[in-house]
Amino acid sequence: MNSETGALRRGWTTGTCASAAARAAFEALLGIEPEDPVPVTLPSGARPTFALARLDRGSGFVRAGIVKDAGDDPDVTHGALVLATLRFGAPATGIVFRAGPGVGIVTKPGLPLPPGEPAINAMPRRMIRTALTEVAEANGVTCDLVVEVGIEDGERIAERTMNRRLGIIGGLSILGTTGVVVPYSCAAWIASIHRGIDVARAEGLTHLAGATGATSEAAIRNLYGLPEQALIDMGDFVGGMLKYIRGHPVARVTIAGGFAKMTKLAQGRLDLHSKREAIDFRWLAELYCSIGGKAESGMSVRTANTALEVLQMAQAEHVPIAPAIARSACRVAAGALARADIALDVAIFDRDGCLIASERC
């Protein structure tokens, strides 16, 4: 964080780091002392520079490394060493990409890259090509190169990502569309939702379940016996998931979550994050009284601190608040999906993963 302005500090994508590493490795492969810090051209035209963290020369190859700085974003790859190993390729073969240790291989259809390809996305490939072309043109050589991109300890780090579920095996993905990591950006999560839906559809799955968290995901999987690829890590972005499914349909969609998150959905919120959308306890009190709750209890609902407090009160007084929330959440979700040909339902679970309400929309 900037100590003067309080603004969150931006960082760099794995694609940007791989581009810098590839540039340095190519210069060293040509017998040139690499620039340090290493310049990289971003899609915007900006040219940041990166400290060279590693340079190894071997028989017929050079390996360079850049430490990823994700800024103030809680990125699992922050601090990881991104490596590029370069070798000369056969004449007229151009740039050939390979997955090094810690970078995964695509094994399932539905992703932007076909099965068998290293998980190096389109923009990072373009950025790497740009970096290598700059070096080649400056030195009067061609870009017939084998570029192996790796991430130190990437296979272990990948266990904390969605890669295995998406069919990316063996490590992390080299990502980025702008080259820059925006702290706490929604874009990366929503992109992973889209990729999860794409993979599930390519697998021929017809029933997908979007869950707000690990408890509801495990519960909905057990309830319906769903395969892992049918589970979409929706998080707070129910609106983003439904909008994408509207244009990329499946036969059935289930939305699963806890009582608090589903209360926000019932109130018309399509972004369920606590910092962006708060529960309207006045609305909840009116609902509580409309389904048989006592007036004095309604006053307690209005002044409640948490949704859990309201749920416990309703359970003690036998007021069917969870089914009422499920019905309202269904109406909101159906409006966002806007596809009568897609079966839609909502399931609400308690903190132990027990189903407390469900509704077909």
Swiss-Prot record:
Root EC class: transferase
UniProt cross-references to InterPro entries, sorted A to Z: CbiD, CbiD_sf
Pfam families xrefs: CbiD
What one GO molecular function would you report for this record?
Answer: cobalt-precorrin-5B C1-methyltransferase activity
Instruction: Answer whether the UniProt record assigns the keyword Methyltransferase to this protein.
Output: yes
User: A GO biological process this protein is involved in?
Assistant: methylation
| Catalyzed reactions | Co-precorrin-5B + S-adenosyl-L-methionine = Co-precorrin-6A + S-adenosyl-L-homocysteine
Q: What is its EC number?
A: 2.1.1.195
According to the lineage, what is the superkingdom? Answer: Bacteria
- Keywords, comma-separated and alphabetical: Cobalamin biosynthesis, Methyltransferase, Plasmid, S-adenosyl-L-methionine, Transferase
Q: In which pathway does it act?
A: Cofactor biosynthesis; adenosylcobalamin biosynthesis; cob(II)yrinate a,c-diamide from sirohydrochlorin (anaerobic route): step 6/10
Q: Which NCBIfam families match?
A: cbiD, PRK00075.1-1
Which family does the record assign? Belongs to the CbiD family.
What the entry lists under HAMAP family is as follows:
CbiD (MF_00787)
* Protein name (record): Cobalt-precorrin-5B C(1)-methyltransferase
